[in-house]
Each structure stands twice: as C-alpha cells, then as structure tokens.
C-alpha cells in the first residue's frame, strides 16, 4: 500500500471514495507518523482516541455512501481555535489547562463535513510572532534543513505548527490564522500552500483573538487544490461573528485549473526593496514569466503607501491586542498567581502568565492608546490603513485582477537567530504580507523555488475582495510550473 501520509488531501479523499483504504487506516498512519515526528514539536496535544473514534464514524458513513466533503480526512488544528472539551491554550501559560465548553465555528464546520481531528498544533503565543519561538511549549522545528547542515530552522509563524505538520506529512491539512502574514509566511518557509481569505469570509467566533480587525482563519495544505477544498468547509456566514460577511461560499476547488488567460497581474514597484536578495528578485521574475506563459498580462502598478504598512500594522495590532488580552486576569479561567489583594493577583497572574513578546506588544498597545498619544499614533495609523486600502482599490479599479509579490524577504532562518537581536528584525519578516491584512484582502502563498541552500521560497498573490478563486487559479499555475516541495525525512 502507498504511504498514506504522502498523499495530498484530494488524493486521500479520492482513495477513501474508491475504498482503497479506510478512514481508520488513514488516521492510524498519521498518528504513527506524528509519534515519529515529535522532535519537530508541531503538536502541543495529540488526540488519538478522539481521532480514531471520528475515523470509525467516517467509515460508517462511507459504508452507507454518506458523508461530507472532508469525510475521514485527518487534520491538525492550530491551538488558537476553541475545541470543546479539549485543551485550548493559544500556547500561553496564562490559559493553563483551559478546556472550552464550546467549539469554534471554523472547526465545527470541519467536523460537520466529516474531518478527523488529530490534535492541537503549536503556534506563537496568542499568535504574536513570526517564527513560532514565543510558544510556552517551546519552538517548532522546520522539517526542512539547509543542504549539508543540521542547524534547526524556524517554520515561520505564528502558524508554525500548522505549516511544519503539513510539510512533514503528519496531517493532510491544518487550520491556521493570519493577522499580518501568519498563514502565508510559514507556508513559504516550509514549501506548503497558505491561503488567507478575505476578512469576514471565515468566522472568528471561538478563535482566540489577537487583533480583531486583522485576524482571519484559513488553511495550510500541501497543494493549492487541498487549500481550496479546506477553505470551502471553513468559510461561511456566522451570525455569532458581527464581522462575518453573509455571502455565498463558492466551490473553490472548481477554480483549480481554470484558465488565467487575459487576467491582468500587477507587479508593485514598491515591493522592490533595497537589499532584497537576488534569488528573491529572480524568483519573482520567474513567477511573472510563468503567469505570462499561461496567458496572463503583466503590468507594473504602484502601491505608494506600502512603506508605511509595517509601522502602521505594529501600532494597530498591538493596540487591539492590549484590549483583547485585558480579559486574562486569572479570575474565571486559566492560570492564576496569588497576591495579597486582587490588584496584586491580577499583576502577578499577567506577569507570570504572558511571555516576553506578548508583554511587549501589550505595552506598545497600551502606550499608543493612552491619552496624549492616541492621535499621534493610533489615529494616524488608522488613517494610513485607509490609504493602503485605497491603493489596492485604485489598482483593482484600473482592471488589475491580482497582485504578484514575494511572500517573504528570505528563506527560513535558524532557531534563536533573530530572537536575541532587535525585535524589529523579526517584525520585518512580515513586510510583504501585512498589506493584505491592513486592506482585508485575500492572499495565497505558493512554493515556487529554492534558495542556494535548498530551502523553499514562496510567491504571494493578493486578490480583489472575496475573489479567492482568482488567487487559487493563479496560484495553481505557479504550482504546476514550480512542482511540489517535500523535505527529506531526517527525524
């Protein structure tokens, strides 16, 4: 029998339909692979008993020719999504052993469609990070290594566990979230596909909040087709989320293989940065050539406020985080540190419960919202955000269908390489991705090549609002030209 963990999600779905193997066999293969790959630290909680029970139920549905589009397919869940009765911590000490009494909308829709939960995946604490090094469970290790080196690399963040697990073949796909690039950047670092939908396309209800006006759930998968299949189940209107958009969910998989002839692709001149590595520049040109060969038209465009996106993001996001994280006080749930009075208890709980990066962002956020600084920082950042959004609107009104950019300014770096230096060095990893969040647009990262050391590099496509289908079709063109990227097993 084929190694079941090497299948794409679409191949596994088709194999189950043909009864080439059972959902239980597929799940057991992934559970065994998870055991072998524990050194990667991708999972913070494995749920084998629940997974096998869900797989048996899926097999029962298959026997009756019933079941949803994800029936029997084993997935990993980022530890930011509430899973009823199953520990959910956002990878922070402050949530302790918290077991939610409810299920997030996104995961409930996956289970509705028959998916199997393998466990909870590691992420940066409260999704604050670009390398998955801020988790209270320790860093995630990228399954990729530089040629001839055994230096352990980061998988990107904050959805590092999701990306690492998909790349290593220890789940068929994974849920993730993207606030400033947390789906697309780790996908680029691990040779996987990361799809951030339009803001409001997937419900945020039951997902631990970082920055509410920026957070958006989406999938990380091995192929563009797999990401499209997962997004169809994850998306949809939810009356419990006031930012959820009541709009029909299309069949995203139907966009895979659709002709891109005549589509107009913008190449933003502002993304050509000083000091950009030549291999990133070359990859970008190669991606443009692939799209042109498929019949797309290339045009240079201008997004003049791009240079302000990163500083504006690092004002807006911490400001919202400082408000969202005020609820963690040790009173009703999560970890609690004792104090001689209630104020001291609050202070001790938050000081011991939050990690250094989360504390840093809470302090930045509290500062920019404080009297005397609100207008100078937060209000100005929101005005910049409006201008960034208008830049994209102007491009799309001029007939551009999607914008092609690099996904990251470099390949994956070593664990500890950037955490010990200036935190701004780490923040610069989001330079190509934050604009899509600030404007609420859909974006996809697709593996497109390798650097000189054999590490995967990705390209990003940013689409019109609610036109995920365009970036799926275009992303699949790049995928077909570049081929699949799979790391050699060393673990």
From Swiss-Prot:
SUPFAM superfamilies: Amidase signature (AS) enzymes (SSF75304)
Gene: gatA
The keyword Lipid biosynthesis appears for this protein: no
EC assignment: 6.3.5.7
InterPro entries, alphabetized: Amidase (IPR000120), Amidase_CS (IPR020556), Amidase_dom (IPR023631), AS_sf (IPR036928), GatA (IPR004412)
Assembly and interaction partners: Heterotrimer of A, B and C subunits.
GO cellular component, one term: glutamyl-tRNA(Gln) amidotransferase complex
Transmembrane annotation, as ranges: none
Active site annotation, chain numbering: 78 (charge relay system), 158 (charge relay system), 182 (acyl-ester intermediate)
Family that this chain belongs to: Belongs to the amidase family. GatA subfamily.
Function: Allows the formation of correctly charged Gln-tRNA(Gln) through the transamidation of misacylated Glu-tRNA(Gln) in organisms which lack glutaminyl-tRNA synthetase. The reaction takes place in the presence of glutamine and ATP through an activated gamma-phospho-Glu-tRNA(Gln).
Organism: Nitrobacter winogradskyi (strain ATCC 25391 / DSM 10237 / CIP 104748 / NCIMB 11846 / Nb-255)
Keywords: ATP-binding, Ligase, Nucleotide-binding, Protein biosynthesis
GO molecular-function terms, A-Z: ATP binding; glutaminyl-tRNA synthase (glutamine-hydrolyzing) activity
NCBIfam families on file: gatA
Biological processes, Gene Ontology terms: translation
Pfam families tied to this protein: Amidase (PF01425)
Protein name: Glutamyl-tRNA(Gln) amidotransferase subunit A
Reactions catalysed according to its record: L-glutamyl-tRNA(Gln) + L-glutamine + ATP + H2O = L-glutaminyl-tRNA(Gln) + L-glutamate + ADP + phosphate + H(+)
């Amino acid at each position: 029998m084929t190694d079941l963990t090497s299948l794409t999600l679409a191949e596994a779905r088709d194999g189950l339909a043909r009864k080439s193997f059972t959902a239980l066999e597929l799940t057991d293969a992934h559970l065994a692979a998870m055991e072998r790959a524990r050194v990667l630290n991708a999972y913070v909680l494995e749920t084998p008993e629940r997974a096998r029970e869900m797989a048996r139920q899926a097999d029962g549905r298959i026997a009756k020719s019933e079941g949803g589009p994800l029936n029997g397919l084993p997935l990993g869940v980022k530890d930011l999504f509430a899973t009823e009765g199953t520990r959910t911590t956002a990878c922070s000490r402050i949530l302790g052993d918290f077991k939610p009494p409810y299920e997030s909308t996104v995961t409930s829709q996956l289970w509705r469609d028959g998916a199997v939960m393998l466990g909870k995946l590691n992420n940066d604490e409260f999704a604050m990070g670009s390398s998955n090094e801020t988790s209270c469970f320790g860093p995630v290790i990228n399954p990729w290594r530089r040629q001839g080196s055994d230096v352990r690399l980061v998988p990107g963040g904050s959805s590092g566990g999701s990306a690492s697990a998909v790349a290593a073949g220890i789940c068929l796909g994974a849920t993730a979230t993207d606030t400033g690039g947390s789906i697309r950047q780790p996908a680029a670092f691990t040779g996987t596909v990361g799809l951030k939908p339009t803001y409001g396309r997937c419900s945020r209800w039951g997902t631990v909040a970082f920055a509410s006006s920026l957070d958006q759930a989406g999938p990380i998968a091995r192929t563009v087709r797999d990401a499209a299949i997962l997004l169809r189940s994850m998306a949809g209107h939810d009356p419990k989320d006031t930012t959820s958009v009541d709009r029909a969910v299309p069949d995203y998989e139907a966009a895979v293989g659709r002709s891109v002839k005549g589509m107009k692709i913008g190449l933003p001149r502002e993304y050509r940065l000083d000091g950009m590595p030549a291999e990133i520049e070359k990859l970008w040109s190669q991606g443009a050539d692939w799209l042109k060969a498929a019949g797309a038209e290339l045009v240079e465009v201008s997004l003049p406020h791009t240079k302000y996106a990163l500083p504006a993001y690092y004002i807006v996001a911490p400001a919202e985080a400082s408000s969202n994280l005020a609820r963690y006080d040790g009173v009703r749930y999560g970890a609690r540190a004792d104090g001689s009075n209630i104020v001291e208890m609050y202070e001790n709980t938050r000081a011991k419960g939050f990690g250094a990066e989360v504390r840093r962002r809470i302090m930045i956020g509290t500062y920019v919202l404080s009297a005397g600084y609100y207008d100078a920082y937060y209000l100005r950042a929101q005005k910049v955000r409006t201008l960034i959004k208008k830049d994209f609107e102007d491009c799309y009104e001029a007939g551009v269908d999607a914008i092609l950019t690099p996904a990251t300014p470099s390949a994956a770096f070593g664990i500890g390489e950037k955490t010990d230096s200036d935190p701004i060095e780490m923040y610069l990893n989001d330079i190509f991705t934050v604009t899509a969040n600030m404007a609420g647009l859909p974006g996809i990262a697709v593996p497109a090549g390798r650097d000189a050391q054999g590490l995967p590099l990705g390209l990003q496509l940013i689409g019109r609002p609610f036109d995920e289908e365009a970036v799926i079709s275009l992303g699949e063109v790049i995928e077909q030209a570049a081929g699949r990227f799979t790391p050699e097993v060393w673990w």
